[in-house]
Design a protein with these regions (language model features):
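Single conserved hydrophobic/aromatic residue that forms the stacking wall/gate
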Residues: 1-8
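Active-site loops and adjacent core secondary-structure elements that bind or stabilize anionic groups
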Residues: 11-12
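Active-site-proximal alpha-helical scaffold in enzymes
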Residues: 48-75, 114
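Condensing-enzyme catalytic core mediating Claisen C-C bond formation in acyl metabolism
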Residues: 1, 91-155, 160
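Short glycine-enriched loops at secondary-structure junctions
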Residues: 23-29, 79-80, 119
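Oxyanion-binding "anion nests"
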Residues: 150-180
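Short glycine/threonine-rich loop-to-helix capping motif typified by GTGT followed
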Residues: 33-37, 176-186
Length: 186
C-alpha cells in the first residue's frame, strides 16, 4: 500500500488516489515493474527506456496531467546491476574484467508523485530526445554512443525555450561515462 511509504508526510495519499502508475526497469519485459503494478492495483503504463526510464516516466506523467487526463501519477524506475550485466554485457559468473570505459548499472529504485499545482519541484518543460545512431556498438563503452543524442536534446531544449544555460545549477544527463561526458562537453 502506497500510504505506508508516506508515513510521517503531510500528504495523505492512498492507492485509490493515484490515477496511473508509470514505471519501468532494465529487465526483460519489465517484470519487476509489472509485479509492483500487480501488487498496487493501479492502472499501469509499463515503459522501457533503459537509462531514460525515470525521465521518460516523469515527462509522460507531466503531459498526462497537463492535458487533464490525470490528477496524480506515481512514476518510477528501477535497475539491478547483476541483471543488467547478464542482459547487456556478460554474466558475472564468467569473471570477465570490465574495461575502463564501461558504465556500472546501479542496483536501486526511485519514484516520484506528479500532481498539478503543488509545492516543490515542477516539470516546467519537456524536451524529448531523438535516436541518433553513430554506429557505436561496444556494450562496454556506451557513453560515446549516447553522447550525440544527449547533445542534441540539450541543444534542442535551449533552442526551444531560449533559457540561459548559466541560469542552471546543474545540467544532468544519464551516465555517459568519462569518454561520453567529454564528447558531450566538447
Amino acid at each position: 500500500e502506497i500510504s505506508e511509504c508516506l508515513v510521517g508526510s503531510e500528504m495523505c495519499i492512498r492507492d485509490r488516489d493515484i490515477n496511473y502508475l508509470i514505471g519501468g526497469d532494465l529487465i526483460n519485459q519489465i517484470v519487476p515493474s509489472s509485479f509492483a503494478a500487480r501488487e498496487l492495483g493501479i492502472p499501469f503504463f509499463g515503459i522501457y527506456g533503459a537509462c531514460s526510464t525515470m525521465a521518460e516516466g516523469m515527462c509522460l506523467s507531466a503531459m498526462l496531467i497537463d492535458g487533464g487526463f490525470a490528477d496524480l501519477i506515481l512514476s518510477g524506475a528501477s535497475s539491478h546491476y547483476c541483471t543488467a550485466e547478464r542482459q547487456f554485457r556478460f554474466p558475472l559468473e564468467l569473471g570477465n574484467q570490465k574495461p575502463m570505459t564501461a558504465q556500472w548499472t546501479v542496483t536501486g529504485a526511485g519514484s516520484v508523485l506528479i500532481a498539478p499545482n503543488k509545492e516543490g519541484p515542477k516539470v516546467k518543460y519537456v524536451t524529448v530526445g531523438k535516436v541518433i545512431d553513430e554506429g557505436i556498438d561496444d556494450g562496454n563503452n556506451m557513453g560515446p554512443a549516447m553522447a550525440p543524442a544527449a547533445v542534441d536534446t540539450i541543444y534542442s531544449y535551449f533552442n526551444d525555450t531560449k533559457d540561459d544555460p548559466n541560469s542552471f545549477d546543474l545540467i544532468i544527463t544519464g551516465d555517459l561515462g568519462k569518454i561520453g561526458k567529454q564528447i558531450t562537453e566538447d
